[in-house]
Regions:
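Conserved HGGG/HGGXW glycine-rich cap/lid loop of the alpha/beta-hydrolase fold
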Residues: 32-90
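Flexible "cap/lid" loop of the alpha/beta hydrolase fold
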Residues: 129-137, 143-179
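Conserved acidic catalytic loop of the alpha/beta-hydrolase fold
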Residues: 101-119
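Conserved alpha/beta-hydrolase "nucleophile elbow" surrounding the catalytic nucleophile
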Residues: 119, 123-125
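Conserved loop-alpha-helix segment in the C-terminal half of the alpha/beta-hydrolase fold
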Residues: 227-265, 273
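Short beta-strand/loop motif that positions the catalytic acidic residue
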Residues: 217, 223-225
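Active-site nucleophile elbow and catalytic-triad environment of alpha/beta-hydrolase enzymes
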Residues: 197-213
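Catalytic active-site module of serine/aspartate enzymes centered on a nucleophile-bearing elbow/loop
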Residues: 255-292
Length: 292
């Protein structure tokens, strides 16, 4: 557990922003004032960050050392809508579970607020769960989905990962960039411990999105994992099979969904690899449907 927190601290220690000034706002959605930023122009894509993260810490190259600014790269050809989900960053917490289902409903309401009929969605970790639920609960709003490191059932994670979450405390983040950024951005800067406990209480609940519901989703999905991710390898392949994977594309039609497993990558370290992942994402999002 201490190792995970240390890695997160190191990753967040060089927060930088070389962004051109975006359009920003707060959307009234489901009892939230949800903070969002819009960068660039083109086909819309929504970015959903991971637990304890913000737009800056997840997407705008916070780690320095030449790592890729996801928003800068994606907004070269797309309208990027980056949000801060319930309790994170500039979006205050409210009295409800911080669950993928609730977060997905917020994304749907945000798109309504912005008068965007549908969008591609990229979600990392907790944001990946919200992206999955967008495809399940709001299929009319979703074109394609990129899921970076999430499982659609609790048992899709390795035991060590499930065992670690209940042990997270606000004290573990004391003095860290995660705590510092929360206190800098949050409308309730003195509520960091409450936020950690609330997020933990939501995250430790067993969940199952349902294989049948997952299989029935219409949106093509691109699953991206590290080979030391914390998601079980069997679960990665199960998700891909549910979306039509595990075929010989040389001998017949292949799935419009995709799977990538990056070597030598952990759950956290995946976000170092934007220079590898973003071109694959762009290719996936730009690919024409075989049904067109």
């Amino acid at each position: 557990m201490k190792t995970t927190v240390f890695i997160l601290m190191m990753l967040l220690s060089g927060v930088v922003s070389a962004q051109q000034k975006p359009t920003t706002g707060y959307a009234p959605v489901n009892g939230l004032k949800m903070y969002y930023e819009i960068h660039g122009s083109g086909e819309p894509v929504v970015l959903l960050h991971g637990a304890f993260m913000t737009i800056t810490s997840n997407w705008t190259a916070p780690w320095g050392n030449g790592t890729t600014n996801w928003i800068a790269e994606l907004s070269k050809t797309r309208k990027v809508i980056a949000v801060e989900m319930q309790g994170h960053g500039r979006t205050a917490d409210i009295d409800r579970d911080i669950s993928p289902e609730n977060l997905a409903d917020d994304v749907s309401a945000l798109l309504d607020h912005l008068k965007i009929p549908s969008a591609d969605i990229i979600g990392y970790s907790l944001g990946g769960g919200a992206a999955m639920q967008c495809a399940i609960r709001h299929p009319e709003k979703v074109r394609k989905v990129v899921i970076i490191s999430f499982a659609f059932r609790s048992d899709g994670w390795v035991k060590e990962k499930n065992d670690a979450m209940p042990k997270i405390t606000a004290e573990a983040f004391k003095g860290s960039p995660i705590e510092t950024e929360y206190k800098k951005l949050s409308p309730t800067p003195d509520k960091f411990a409450d936020f950690v406990n609330h997020l933990k209480a939501s995250a430790v609940k067993p969940y199952d999105f349902g294989a049948d519901k997952f299989k029935a989703t219409k949106a093509p999905m691109f699953f991206i994992f590290g080979d030391a991710d914390g998601v079980r390898l069997e679960h990665m392949s199960e998700m891909f099979r549910l979306k039509g994977g595990d075929v010989s594309g040389d001998l017949g039609p292949r799935s419009e969904s995709r799977l990538a497993i990056l070597p030598g990558m952990t759950h956290v370290a995946l976000m170092f690899r934007g220079q590898t992942i973003i071109p694959m994402i762009n290719e996936f999002l730009d690919a024409k449907s075989s049904k067109q």
